[in-house]
């Protein structure tokens, strides 16, 4: 896939090794080693220059690489349509499998709709998925 190739081109092996130590729950083979600012820039670029590819990427779950999940979160966070952000967030939450992806995922649009977000947070808090609950607590 084009987006995965873009991430692989940004690989930094020493950074991958560092990241693997921070997130021992993820197999090192699933970590490319892309720095967060580069992933955020790629998310913005994809939404601006290749929006169809970006939206198709959001529909393809699960992802294999840790960075694919982070990029997924960063793309969602850039969306301007509250309903779409909620839709994609709800679809994505069960696939979050580590603290780092969970804690970096913060759609700014949530700040504009606190009451609406709270109703979703209350649902997410009831989840059996560890990182869905962690995410809900972080949103609060």
Where in this protein do the model-derived segments appear?
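Alpha-helical scaffold domains
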Residues: 1-140
């Amino acid at each position: 896939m084009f987006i995965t190739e873009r991430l692989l081109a940004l690989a930094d092996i020493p950074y991958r090794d560092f990241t693997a130590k921070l997130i021992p729950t993820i197999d090192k083979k699933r970590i490319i080693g892309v720095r967060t600012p580069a992933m955020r820039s790629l998310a913005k670029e994809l939404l601006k220059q290749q929006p169809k590819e970006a939206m198709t990427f959001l529909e393809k779950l699960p992802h294999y690489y840790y960075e694919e999940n982070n990029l997924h979160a960063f793309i969602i966070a850039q969306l301007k349509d509250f309903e779409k952000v909620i839709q994609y967030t709800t679809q994505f939450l069960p696939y979050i499998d580590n603290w780092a992806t969970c804690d970096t995922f913060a759609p700014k649009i949530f700040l504009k709709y606190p009451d609406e977000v709270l109703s979703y947070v209350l649902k997410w808090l009831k989840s059996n998925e560890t990182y869905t609950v962690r995410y809900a607590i972080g949103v609060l």
